[in-house]
């Protein structure tokens, strides 16, 4: 391989290492295509700078441990429902209709308890589904190595 192509190949490989993998989740009988965010880079990027999120799409943030979580909407351009799930994938907290934030200071949306999984959906989805605390989240697909 030519040395002049090596930097481009390395860049592409590094971007792929931080890309969110895809699968699906089911919540209250509704299935959503999902992107898994399992490392610091993909969790930090989240749904930033996206101009839309389909009604049947989501992002699932996966962490290695249970602890109180807090999300913010910095550079997120669309309102979201933020749902927090414990290690058993039971819904423990909801922050509904979290609004976009383009400049500091941005509001913080904390969980009300320990969470290992955080699901972001298009704002209004949780209400339409009639979600209640204790709901179970089913995950299909391999999220990859959680770091």
Predicted regions located by residue number:
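Bacterial N-terminal signal peptides that target proteins for export
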Residues: 1-6
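General helical structural elements
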Residues: 7-8, 47
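N-terminal signal peptide c-region/cleavage motif recognized by signal peptidases
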Residues: 14-17
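Compact, glycine-rich, soluble single-domain proteins
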Residues: 20-147
